[in-house]
Amino acid sequence: MAGNAYSDEVLGATNWLKEKSNQEVFSFVFKNENVQLNGKDIGWNSYKKELQEDELKSLQRGAETTWDQSEDMEWETTVDEMTKKQVFIFDSLVKKCLFEVLNTKNIFPGDVNWFVQHEWGKDQGWHCHVLIGGKDFSQAQGKWWRRQLNVYWSRWLVTACNVQLTPAERIKLREIAEDNEWVTLLTYKHKQTKKDYTKCVLFGNMIAYYFLTKKKISTSPPRDGGYFLSSDSGWKTNFLKEGERHLVSKLYTDDMRPETVETTVTTAQETKRGRIQTKKEVSIKTTLKELVHKRVTSPEDWMMMQPDSYIEMMAQPGGENLLKNTLEICTLTLARTKTAFDLILEKAETSKLTNFSLPDTRTCRIFAFHGWNYVKVCHAICCVLNRQGGKRNTVLFHGPASTGKSIIAQAIAQAVGNVGCYNAANVNFPFNDCTNKNLIWVEEAGNFGQQVNQFKAICSGQTIRIDQKGKGSKQIEPTPVIMTTNENITVVRIGCEERPEHTQPIRDRMLNIHLTHTLPGDFGLVDKNEWPMICAWLVKNGYQSTMASYCAKWGKVPDWSENWAEPKVPTPINLLGSARSPFTTPKSTPLSQNYALTPLASDLEDLALEPWSTPNTPVAGTAETQNTGEAGSKACQDGQLSPTWSEIEEDLRACFGAEPLKKDFSEPLNLD
């Protein structure tokens, strides 16, 4: 910037603003409103009474001098004298209010930076902007300053009012000015407390960017917005003409512009968040994320898996409610984002699928005892657990005692984790524990009675609202139901009357699994890892848990009278060390089947099959051997399970073809 390019006044004002650019100051607005008292109109220009105090007269003369010196002689102003006089009086009254408050605080005026500008707005009319600040000012004093200035401003306005008012009317005018806050302070509303706090502005920036850019009013009455006159504590902008003011603003803007402008991109989520999170909120969110990740669904699980966070929340004020609400958010997140099938599948150890044998699982053995296609039954159950069964949203295990109903249901519920239990003893609120769950378990269901309609809605996967004890009603989203019973739940009795109209609707909502085969006493429980492995096996072998996949595999949607035995399960072969399908032919040896021929030893080695005979096995073909064939078969079954002769023959034909086998089988048996 060349030194002789601009006047000393312009450069002085620019440098002065740059020195004060980072000083924080209060921003006040002085105004008045049109008032009517007992038919007497008091407007913005009703305060032209001659001032009597010498200090006020001196301030008024200073305002007149500022107007004259800052007036641009290139065009003639048309602002009338009455408007000018009113502005001069307002200027003296505003400065008088400022000086009186400074005296109250024992602050020397020379230690304060201030700026005053009188303006006219299209909507607001006359108003005066005041910036004031210094080393003895703090943000907490802003509201106190506003109250004091409001009191002095109302008092001096009443003194300067040239309308003939009675003493009572003067008091009323002052009350109106104080109650309506004719002096306002720039504030902001805190997002958390919702309270107003003082908003400080930067002294130099506010003047250069806002006040100096406005146009001067040159007509009376004013047609457009603009400023009348301005003054400051440094006497730097008092006598600047409109063009010089704009030049100061431009020079200040150019000098204060940063060399590099850094841009930041704010995402919509950050804008929405918008507030500062407390440490407590951050801690709760972190804990909640860990609980969801570890699938914690009960206080007991929390105590065992995350004891530190549990103790931390328990020690806080209102810790019990905090624990309860946090756990409720966790279960709600799981219920809305995962299905019961998803929670089961994620527990599967996929590395063990290579050696996993589906027929060996206790669940499939129970189904196989009935001659069922256990793959088909498990596939149907998984579709319901994945909320893909449509209206048939309930898996019903029913039949006599000790047939395996509860152990299968218990294994599924344990694998899901987030399970709600129906409480038949709580007559008024039986579903109190069933909200925000991935699975509803109804153990030993009985007569539905008065609750039949509510049961039908939940069993069909509808969204309904239920009553809770001590709370308002709550919504249950579509949730799979698993149910066990020894009774015929399709027969509904209300009092002593049977209601047959409910029978078919109940059947339409159930996946009917009727177990009748009594299990031996040493059968044992279903392993906790069994159902995750079953689900993983089904997915790996193309049995997706969707009704479309089920229909593609088995032909149609299952109904109440579904025949689980059709189609038959293909008989697995070459499963060393695994049990055979219970509904295939009994285990046998060549002795029990009276075969005259046996494969060559080299063939057995090629097939990696262990021979069924031992050195103590009687020789085939003798009378002793024929009489003890049954005992030999039983001994073989009691020992390590071996392939049947029919299976070996089938494998040999697959490996060597029919012609070589025909030749081998035609040779006489040589047992030497």
From Swiss-Prot:
Gene Ontology CC terms, in alphabetical order: host cell nucleus
Keyword rRNA processing applies: no
Source species: Murine minute virus (strain MVM prototype) (MVM)
Region (Disordered): 613-643
Mod. after translation: Phosphorylated.
Pfam family, one: Parvo_NS1
Compartment(s): Host nucleus
Enzyme Commission number, as recorded: 3.1.21.-, 3.6.4.12
UniProt keywords, alphabetically: ATP-binding, Covalent protein-DNA linkage, DNA replication, DNA-binding, Endonuclease, G1/S host cell cycle checkpoint dysregulation by virus, Helicase, Host G2/M cell cycle arrest by virus, Host nucleus, Host-virus interaction, Hydrolase, Magnesium, Metal-binding, Modulation of host cell apoptosis by virus, Modulation of host cell cycle by virus, Nuclease, Nucleotide-binding, Transcription, Transcription regulation, Viral DNA replication, Viral genome packaging, Viral release from host cell
Region of interest called DNA-binding, as start-end residue ranges on this chain: 1-276
Protein name, per record: Initiator protein NS1
Gene this chain is encoded by: NS1
Subunit structure: Homooligomer; when bound to DNA. Interacts with human SYNCRIP. Interacts with host transcription factor SP1; this interaction allows high levels of viral P38 promoter transactivation by NS1.
TM helices/strands, residue ranges: none
Domain SF3 helicase stretches: 373-528
Annotated binding of ATP, by residue: G399, P400, A401, S402, T403, G404, K405, S406
Cofactor(s) it depends on: Mg(2+)
